Amino acid sequence: MSRKKKSRKPGAAGAPEFMVTRNRSESDVAGRLRKKDKKRKGLKAGGRNSEEGAQQKHGSSQVRDPRLGSKKKIPLIVEPAKKLTKQERRLSAEQELEMLENDAKLNVLLDRIESGENLGRGLQQYVDEKLDRIEQLMSQLGLLEPEAEEEFEEEAPVRKSRSDDDLLADFEDFDMDDYKG
């Protein structure tokens, strides 16, 4: 069969029966919007340069040159660090004592020791160091009470040094019959 050429005459086969006519400007606007949406699917290009635009939105109205540094004055003479006063040292010692008393790890280890558990060498050393520091801080702050051992030594009767004659007299007066059963 031979091929038929399409004709351009109206009313030819395959041609729509009615034509839809649109306003040209409306069609142009719709087409541009579709094209715009299609173009802007990804991220914006030029990530290096976008920082300047973001800074202008957030920053002040004055444009700053990033090459200029800080205007803060730097002292040319180094002043020695000031020493803490007695009250400041005492306050810091109180704070350190408070921290040590509230130390969760130390409290857990002390509870384990009280329950009769033996700690490893490292943990025992940690506990000893912390307790020594607590004792040192308490004595520094004047919170440490005298220990019981010191009280016993003070309560012991004080004996006068006795001469040899007194000791010999006690020995001679000693009665062995009192101890026989």
From Swiss-Prot:
One of its GO terms (biological process) is ribosome biogenesis. Keywords: GTPase activation, Ribosome biogenesis. The keyword rRNA processing does not apply. Residues 32-43 have a biased composition (Basic residues). The keyword Phosphoprotein does not apply. GO terms for molecular function: GTPase activator activity. InterPro entries: YihI. Residues 1-75, 145-181 are annotated as: Disordered. Residues 146-155, 166-181 have a biased composition (Acidic residues). Belongs to the YihI family. This is Der GTPase-activating protein YihI. It comes from Vibrio vulnificus (strain CMCP6).
